[in-house]
Amino acid sequence: MLEDTQLVWVRDAAEGYIQGRITEIGAKEFEVTPTDRKYPKRTCHFDDIHSSCDGPQDHDDNCELMLLNEATFLDNLKTRYYKDKIYTYVANILIAVNPYREIKELYAPDTIKKYNGRSLGELPPHVFAIADKAIRDMRVYKLSQSIIVSGESGAGKTESTKYLLKYLCYSHDSAGPIETKILDANPVLEAFGNAKTTRNNNSSRFGKFIEVHYDAKCQVVGGYISHYLLEKSRICTQSAEERNYHVFYMLLAGAPQQLRDKLSLGKPDDYRYLSGCTQYFANAKTEQLIPGSQKSKNHQQKGPLKDPIIDDYQHFHNLDKALGRLGLSDTEKLGIYSLVAAVLHLGNIAFEEIPDDVRGGCQVSEASEQSLTITSGLLGVDQTELRTALVSRVMQSKGGGFKGTVIMVPLKIYEASNARDALAKAIYSRLFDRIVGLINQSIPFQASNFYIGVLDIAGFEYFTVNSFEQFCINYCNEKLQKFFNDNILKNEQELYKREGLNVPEITFTDNQDIIELIEAKSNGIFTLLDEESKLPKPSYSHFTAEVHKSWANHYRLGLPRSSRLKAHRTLRDEEGFLVRHFAGAVCYNTEQFIEKNNDALHASLEGLVQECDNPLLQTLFPSGSSTSVRGKLNFISVGSKFKTQLGELMEKLEQNGTNFIRCIKPNSKMIDRQFEGSLALAQLKCSGTISVLELMEHGYPSRVLFADLYSMYKSVLPPELVSLPARTFCEAMFQSLNLSAKDFKFGITKVFFRPGKFVEFDRIMRSDPENMLAIVAKVKKWLIRSRWVKSALGALCVIKLRNRIIYRNKCVLIAQRIARGFLARKQHRPRYQGIGKINKIRTNTLKTIEIASGLKMGREEIISGVNDIYRQIDDAIKKIKMNPRITQREMDSMYTVVMANMNKLTVDLNTKLKEQQQAEEQERLRKIQEALEAERAAKEAEEQRQREEIENKRLKAEMETRRKAAEAQRLRQEEEDRRAALALQEQLEKEAKDDAKYRQQLEQERRDHELALRLANESNGQVEDSPPVIRNGVNDASPMGPNKLIRSENVRAQQQALGKQKYDLSKWKYSELRDAINTSCDIELLEACRQEFHRRLKVYHAWKAKNRKRTTMDENERAPRSVMEAAFKQPPLVQPIQEIVTAQHRYFRIPFMRANAPDNTKRGLWYAHFDGQWIARQMELHADKPPILLVAGTDDMQMCELSLEETGLTRKRGAEILEHEFNREWERNGGKAYKNLGAAKPNGPAAAMQKQQ
């Protein structure tokens, strides 16, 4: 078990992430025990584990999270979702989670007023805050704005768009007639363009860009709606759980009886075009108002569909009123309802074969005669002509006269059915175009300065059967994702580089290759489809084959059998293709691509409706619009038209300021109070929001040019401030407002603000005169104060400089005095020492005279002898003083002669005293002898000390020699590496690109799998594993293992070296490795365990560093930064066993600088004792805290995990110290003595060391 049991987030297939604790460090994975016992223990790769904070997180802006990672991001969304806080920021991007219910007062008029004019971040996140930011940015920057609302189907894009428009129209004043009409457009567009799908009850089946135009005073003056790609196939067919467009059901449920009679309307069961779900949306009240004759059998059995937003009966009346407010008369509204009803009746016209007709023609069935009559009446065409146009078409040959021969070509049943459906689609789609045109006519603008555009377009779609509509929708989403990547990720990072902000680079998946695959001019899918459609006999199988042929080796395009969904693998190669989109792989069935790409009718059918009596239908199909020969099928490319429209939209978005709202679908069942973590996480990843979170950890989303900020204030600046440079003025402004230096950063041309600091930013950018004058006054005050402070500091600096010069002069004199004294002592020290040595004899003679004074006999003789010795001493000293070049040998000879005479005199004295005072003299002589012995012992001790000092100097010199040799070897190795690096640089760059590409492919495979699982759950299908990704000839299913990157040559060589070792420790637990280190006597096993043990420690500490808290100081540094960084400058080496056995103990001491500590406590010392290649003891000394002493075997998690070679300590000058120096500090600070466990391990590693109890 690990001692470090911090909370972590670990990946889970259902919840996204769950909390747990790391209990084991494996060779390649961590073992995590979930805190919730209903989840089993699991082992996961390091990349699937993230640090966790204690306690739940609830932050308005995800950039405020203490730990910024996708797990804490998801947890914050989930926590807020269950608190009904559905909005969250990522910097200035709004994340909106669909609550699937109404939240009280969330969009009330009072809420609109509350957000009016308030800075982003000043109030809780809200869609109104984004709308208000767009208005203020438009006003300040004099630039039109766009709000892009994106997300999956059912994520809440349509509702977010409605509330955005509501705020834009109601925020400043009560809505006038123009604002009311803009808002009335929503129910009309939803009725004709929205439908129930399996994933969304109110799914927009078209895209729209709604522009709200403003004048110079920022008052609404008009609007304009652009729409894209209405899903026409839904008009004729729907799946069992889906419905046609809402307007059909509204008309059947809510139309008055008189209108229903006029339009001959019945119940949904009566119409082939309503063959899907036939239930109405209704609540308890409106259910009673719908006549029973209008209810389908299914509705009567199961009851109505429930939705808090949709009600077919009520919405028909809302639609009728909205059309009236948009300026349509009752006659015009009746014309619209008539065409809607005509489409329903047209769908009921069926065909049957004509008996005995050899040409294979067909006729309208007898049961459909009534539907034919009603349809012709509603369309205003002759019944016979309609019948003829549906079952045949007229063609005109090229020869046989001036105009050629007219030929009546009968149609087969399926051809007639296709013609009928094409007419229905044409009528409805052109009616939709007309309605959008009427809305635009009702909200015209004469003069517009700026506009705010809201983009709501169908989200990424994937079904069991995907056709041309899904292909176009997903292509659009690819373009929007590319715009998001460029606008937020790519361009943002390029701006940071240009401005020199030193923001770490964030990698993201660029989907430009998918867009090129679809829209390339020469061989893009759209181009190939158009070319196929122009052929005399187009074939979808030939088109599909051309797609596969043109893009045979493109990673983004695959065969249907490569899909993970079993249902898709049944398609033949010529029946479809698979595209790996940014959100996941989608398999498209191409059977109807050619038909759906053609937006034209047979000329005979178009001519029929052009000559009708219905005025509205004549408007939809104006005469002269078709220039084709009668009977020929025109070709109008839907794909090319959509691509052109999308290109124009992208140009608009690129010219505008941009705001993003990312809508998130919390669950697939569309119910409230349920949050599926894996589903939400997949959406966040696919939308690029996770990458934005990583970028904004260091990013600055708000910025303004120095020049723009200065020009904004220039008009109110006093004369003394006008001459200031723009940057100087901005710096003075920020200092005067007491803004924290962490909240902003100055670039080369702009000032940038951190996320969540929009209040301060808006405070500066607010252009009202009172605010500007107040800021200018503060700037002036700060400038005056700062100049006085600078003057005072200047004077103080001059005084300090003068004192420094005086101090240096004194230091020079002291240094000179010391140097002269040192030189003199060095020159004369031997003579000083010789004189001192001889003078010691003079001192001994005093005792001799004292003893001789007590003699009764021979006193004069002894004193005479002493005087002779004095003369000898004086003569010797005089000779030494007079002869500067006297040698040590000569001085020793003089000392020996004098000492011999002294000894002789002492012997005589002893002889004379022996008889007189034998006992007393013997005691005195013993003391003299002891003094002489003590002197001799002191002399020997001094000589021993000098020898030890010389030995220590020799050892240090040897250490320095070794260091220099190692340094020279390192320099030579670096030179060799540099030369080799130049040769290998291209190869390494290629490998890096391959690694990045391969990682993207693995991430794409994971997304494909998740998407297939979601689709399989919806359709009760099966998911199969796709073929493994192959890279550089290595299959992921091979022994190399899944998801393994192909490393560089150095790394592969190290892996091979490790693989050849005697012991396989990959399956050993962390605790087993530590026990083996502490107990084993097998040297080879011991070292193998130590290498594996420290390798796992490195991986663990690298993971902790990556997932540390943003505010964490470097209190937990295990070694000085220079030591840790040295490991990245060279590859680790695998040390041979024979070198390990003879490894020696080495000791080091280097300064320890903590970057975040106060200045007075910043410096410390770090001591390390290495037993061979691995650390055995570690000590950290700081003045402000107790010493930290760590011992291997018990404190491994807190100790340096690098090998001695990796630390680079052996190459640091002055870093290595002697054993006694380390032990002296270790024991002084309370450390126990280091012990080896016996002779079995003479140079034992850390396992042989125990921390004494």
Curated annotation (Swiss-Prot):
GO terms for biological process: actin cytoskeleton organization; actin filament organization; actin filament-based movement; asymmetric protein localization involved in cell fate determination; basal protein localization; border follicle cell migration; cell-cell junction maintenance; dorsal closure. GO terms for molecular function: actin binding; actin filament binding; ATP binding; calmodulin binding; microfilament motor activity; microtubule binding; myosin light chain binding; myosin VI light chain binding. Its main location: cytoplasm. Residues 1233-1253 are annotated as: Disordered. Residues 57-766 form the Myosin motor domain. Isoform B is present at a higher level in the head and gonads than in the thoraxes. Isoform 145 kDa is found only in the head. CLIP-190 and jar are coexpressed at several times in development and in a number of tissues, including embryonic axonal neuron processes and posterior pole. The keyword Coiled coil applies. Belongs to the TRAFAC class myosin-kinesin ATPase superfamily. Myosin family. Myosin is a protein that binds to actin and has ATPase activity that is activated by actin. Together CLIP-190 and jar may coordinate the interaction between the actin and microtubule cytoskeleton. May link endocytic vesicles to microtubules and may be involved in transport in the early embryo and in the dynamic process of dorsal closure. It is believed that its function changes during the life cycle. This is Myosin heavy chain 95F. It comes from Drosophila melanogaster. The gene is jar.
